[in-house]
Design a protein with these regions (language model features):
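Walker A (P-loop) phosphate-binding loop of ABC-type ATPase nucleotide-binding domains
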Residues: 43-47
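Conserved ABC transporter NBD signature motif
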Residues: 64-75, 79-80
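Catalytic Walker B motif of ABC-type/P-loop ATPase nucleotide-binding domains
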Residues: 162-166
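Helix-to-loop junction immediately C-terminal to a conserved catalytic motif
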Residues: 56
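Conserved ABC ATPase "signature" region
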Residues: 104, 108, 115-133
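ABC transporter nucleotide-binding domain
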Residues: 178-269
């Protein structure tokens, strides 16, 4: 797991606004991302892809500003472009083209001269595990191989930062773990990464910081590395009886954080000073039966649920989970 260590912020957002066809898509994004690997989360339509496209210069900024590695995306486009590598979610290869030719072409488009671009194409394809298949046509590749080829073209020119859009999408467990291992290795080499994914487990396994978008706004920014070091426990409770909402309110008054789910289920973040017996005692006082209590597998799941409940209306939750 990587830890944030660079003095230069990965991304600084200051009221960033983007309108497409007159419709607001990004609505005043503000926040500082300093991690080595930052997870970008949000439901469909939250603005994740629009944010990537804006950072890459595909969409103009309508208001506010954004700085990537200290470079203003509106005024430093030429100096910023060689610093970024982009792995899109959708297929981006050219049918009939070999992997090495494709990666070489992308490296040239990123600014490398032809000869160094070819050398880096071979290196990148060997690095991701496609060395033996580098002369094969991309349209004969499996889905997992195509994903690796997209990663190779993103790193071939030696960027300082990667934007990865759903890099494990559609992969089987083995290929998924291979991709995540590569992401961690790349980050450990000093390359900064923003990883957009709908798979919370992938984000939790790779990222030291996370930003969650909702309805084009920042719902929360959290330090996952600090959360891993904390002693808080994450529980899931199945309850029956009692006045609706009384038990969650009592837990909040105790210092817990609570997300209410369907069918009277609760996700609860319990501080170190509170023991499980106290949860049962308060349930009894509220006339609530705790029918099941189990440890939750994911602290990030709590964060995401809380952000979806409370974020996105102009207020930003930066308190973690």
């Amino acid at each position: 797991m990587t830890e944030p260590h660079s003095a230069v912020s990965l991304l600084e957002l200051d009221g960033l606004e983007v309108r497409l066809a007159g419709r607001p898509i990004l609505k005043g994004l503000t926040g500082s991302l300093t991690g080595q690997v930052v997870g970008l989360l949000g439901p469909n339509g939250a603005g994740k892809t629009t944010l990537f496209n804006t950072l890459l210069g595909f969409h103009p900024v309508s208001g506010g500003s954004a700085r990537v590695l200290g470079h203003d995306i509106s005024s430093a486009t030429d100096s910023l472009r060689p610093l970024l590598g982009y792995m899109p979610e959708n297929d981006s290869y050219i049918a009939g083209m070999s992997a090495v030719r494709f990666v070489r072409m992308m490296a040239e488009l990123a600014g490398l001269p032809p000869r160094p671009a070819l050398e880096r194409a071979h290196e990148a394809l060997f690095y991701v595990g496609l060395g033996e298949a580098r002369y094969r046509k991309l349209d004969t590749y499996s889905l997992g191989m195509k994903q690796l080829a997209k990663l190779a073209q993103a790193i071939a020119h030696g960027p300082r930062m990667l934007l990865l859009d759903e890099p494990t999408n559609g992969l089987d467990p083995s290929a998924r773990q291979r991709m995540l291992t590569l992401v961690r290795e790349i980050a450990a080499s000093g390359v900064r990464v923003i990883l957009s994914s709908h798979l919370l487990r992938d984000v939790e396994s790779c990222c030291d910081q996370v930003i969650v978008l909702k309805d084009g706004r920042v719902a929360t920014i959290a330090d996952l590395a600090a959360e891993r070091r904390s002693e808080r426990r994450f529980l899931e409770l199945e309850t029956r009886g009692g006045e609706n909402g009384s038990y969650p309110r009592a837990l909040v008054a105790l210092g817990c954080e609570v997300a209410e789910l369907a069918n009277r289920r609760l996700k609860v973040v319990v501080p170190p000073a509170v023991d499980v017996q106290t949860l049962y005692r308060i349930a009894g006082e509220q006339g609530v039966e705790v029918r099941k209590l189990s440890s939750s597998r994911s602290s990030l799941e709590h964060l995401f649920l809380r952000a979806m409940e409370t974020g996105g209306e102009g207020s930003v939750d930066r308190a973690g989970l």
